[in-house]
Amino acid sequence: MKFSCLFSALLIPALVVGQVDIFGYFESEFDHITVSDRGYNYGYNKLRLDLDHSGIDGAAFGANVNIQRYYGNVKWNMLDFFPNEIWEPIFQPLGIEEFPFAVADTLYLDNAYVRLHFNKGDVTIGKQQISLGVGYAWNPLDIFNTKLLLDPTYEQTGVNGFRIEIPVKDRANVDFIISPGSDWKNSTKMITGKLGLRRFDLIGTIGSYNWKRTQLDFQTFQSQYLNLERRMAGGAIVGEIGGIGIWGEGAYNTLKDAENYTELLVGFDYTFENGLYCLAEFYHNGNSPEKFNALDLNNYLQYLNGETHSLLQNYTFIIWQYPLSDFVSIGMINFANLSDKSAALNPQLEWNAFEDVSISFLFGYYMGAENTEFGLQEWNGRIRMRAYF
């Protein structure tokens, strides 16, 4: 019933004024993960509907609806995902061995926006994709999103905002972004400029917003938010030299009542003559602790909630891809936490079984001490099928 009302509310206005395009995909995934000597089987079925209408003079409408239903193990013990040194001093004296949480089915409006076209630029209003930066696995400039290391390019949830894009000249433009909060002080404000120079693009960004970070009271076990006034200034460069793609991205963040910090990323990619593709990145997050023994439970909660880009400071990410045929490719995703010396190897296979159907297989093997970020997990596997329509 809820879906019918939501779908009708999106579809009827577009049908009144003209033709609407409806497309999307169905995705089914099964996963297994072994962590802290416990195995979890789980998965989901997901339907994504995309609505697009560009038949209005000077305007375009777009929306996405996601319906996702989980199966298998939908109730988890959160303490399995923390090293014993992190949770035992807090929970064991109270006789607590489990901190359960459940994964709930979802039905939500991922994006819904109108884009207005003017002679001097475009204005986009509504819940929209705002993804900043040039990095593949991390983006120091992006204060709206965090990425999954096993799937950095997976779609991100839209941001409620107001965006003005003004082209200044060829290969140069300025963006103004506002994401409303409870008042002006708690709203996110950003200005981004982009300039193309020969084989390179230069990006400059400034912004300010209220940074919410989870804080668990260890006496009452009630969650609350720590609000930090954050101002960010940064930039990025992306281009190509001798067939090698190179990029860099950085941001300096000033915080009221907290220590300022820097985030940096550098990367490159290259495709060999035989079709082998390689990408590598190094990332530094000055806001995260440098050593494992400086972590506490709140650091883990903030990372799991997507409130920080990384758990510790220094990371590498490497991906290899090779086409075996027009329909089958193999690859490897490797990432490492240089701060605690843990890492993961994730071989994968992608099969385009039919014209609009792909099936992927992934296996993950994790290395490091049991109290490290990736060493805590033993192995995982994933099978994903996606069919477009």
Regions from the language model: what does each represent?
Residues 20, 57-61, 120-123, 171-174, ...:
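Repeated loop/turn-to-beta-strand initiation elements of outer-membrane beta-barrel proteins
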Residues 24-30, 63-69, 125-127, 176-180, ...:
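Transmembrane beta-barrel strands of outer-membrane/channel proteins
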Residues 30-45:
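Surface-exposed strand-loop-strand hairpins of Gram-negative outer-membrane beta-barrel proteins
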Residues 41-45, 105-110, 156-160, 185-189, ...:
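Residues that define the transmembrane beta-barrel architecture of outer-membrane proteins
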Residues 48-50, 112-115, 163-165, 192-194, ...:
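Outer-membrane beta-barrel architecture
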Residues 57-172, 194-195, 368:
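Outer membrane beta-barrel
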Residues 235-335:
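Detector for outer-membrane/organellar transmembrane beta-barrel domains
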Residues 318, 322, 351, 357-358, ...:
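Outer-membrane beta-barrel "beta-signal"
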